[in-house]
Amino acid sequence: MADIEEQPLPRTFEEFNEQRKAAFIRVKDYKQAGNRLIGFLCSYTPLEIIDAAGAASVALCGTSDEVIPEAEKVLPANLCPLIKSTYGFAYSQKCPFTYFSDMIIGETTCDGKKKMYELLNELKRTHILHLPQGRDRAYEREGWYEECRLLKEELEGFYGITITDDDLRAAVRRRNRLRAAQLEMFALQANQPAAMSGVDLMNTMFAGTFSFDIEAYTQQLEQKVAKLREAYDAGERPVAADAKRILITGCPVGGVINKIGRTIESNGGVVVCMDDCSGERTAAMMIDPEALDILRAIADRYLDINCSVMTPNDGRMENTLAMCEKYHVDGVVESVLQACHTFNVESARMQEAVEGAGIPYMKIETDYSNGDMGQIETRIAAFIETL
C-alpha cells in the first residue's frame, strides 16, 4: 500500500475553488496522520466491518452534474447520473474521498454500477461485494454472509491486521448509537407541524456520510436533536402549520435535495420523511452486539434493507405505507433518476400501494441538471395545491 506522502495532490489542484482545495487538504492531512480511509457508495455496504478494521468509511462524491461531461468520455450518455457523477469525480480527480481512499468497496446492486466499478478499479483499487438479487432463498442469505466474510478477509490482508469478534461488536455498538440518534431526528418530523425543514434534515444526514469520526458525528446529532426538541417544546415553529406533509421515496436524494426537496418546501410543502438510502428505512434496523455469530448478524441486517434491486421487494411498499401513517403524510413524491430501471419499474407498484391507501402520489423522473427545473416546479406546485 503506497504511503500517502508519496501521493501528490491532483494534477488540477490549483484550478479548484477554495472550498474544494480545503476539502482535499483536510483529507490529505487525515491520511498523513496515519489514518485509514475506505470509500463506499451504497447502503448495503456493511460499515461495521470497515469500522472494525480501524478505517473511516466515507461516501464517494456522486451528486453533481459538474463532472458528468468527463464521465461521458468513457461511459454512455444514457446512464444513471449517480453512476456517471461518481465515475466522473474519480476520473477527473475532483473528489478528495475517492482520490485519497485506500480502497473502494463496490457492490453488484444494479447493472450500471457493477460495470462502472470495473472501470473504477483501473483508477483505484476496488473490492466488489456480490449482492444477491433476493433474500428469500437460503443460499442467497448464505452467499451474502460469505461476501461479508470475504470483505473482512480483504481488509485484514490489505492492512495486515486481524479483525476480531470483539472489534465487530464494538463497531456494532457505535453504529447502533448513531442510528438511534438518526431515528430520533427523523421522529421529530412526526410532530404537527414538523420540527424542522426537510431540506435541513436531508442535508444533515447527507453530511454525515462524509464524516471521519462516527462518535463525533453521533454527538453532534444528539446535541442537535436535543436543541430542536427544546426549541419545539418552547413553542418555536419553523414550519407553517398548514404546510402539506410530503414523503419522498425512490432513488438516493443526495443529488436532487435542492431540485426536489427545496422546490417542495418553497411551494407550501414540507418534507417530513425520506424513504430512500439515507432515510429511515436504512437506519431503522439495529444489530444485537451480543449475537453469537456477530458477523452473520451484521450480514443479515444489511441484506434486510429494502431496495428496488431486490426481487421480490414487498417489504418496501409495506414500510412506506407504515411511514405514511407515522408521519401523517399528505402526499408521496417518488424521485426516480433517469435510467434507474429498478426504481422506475417498481414505481408502478409503489403508486398502486400508496394510492390504494388513499394517499396522493406523484413520480418525478429527473437527473442532476437544471434543464427541467421549470417543469418540476410547475408539477410540484400543482401537486401540492391539490392536497
Stretch-by-stretch model annotation:
Residues Q32, I49-T63, E70-A71, C251-P312, ...:
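Redox- and metal-dependent alpha/beta enzyme cores, enriched for Fe-S-associated oxidoreductases
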Residues A2-D3, A348-L387:
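Peripheral docking tails and interdomain loops at the edges
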Residues A90, T311-H328, V345-E346:
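A short, acidic, amphipathic alpha-helical segment used as a generic capping/interface helix at domain edges
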Residues L37-Y91, D102, T109, M116-Y117:
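An N-terminal, globular interaction/scaffold subdomain
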Residues G88-E156:
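Acidic/His-rich segments in extracytoplasmic proteins that coordinate ligands and/or metal ions
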Residues S101, C324, H328-V333:
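Proline-aspartate-enriched helix->loop->beta-strand connector
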Residues L41, L247-T249, S335:
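Short hydrophobic segments within beta-strands
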Residues A2-R36, R149, E153-V271, D275-M286:
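A charged, amphipathic alpha-helical module
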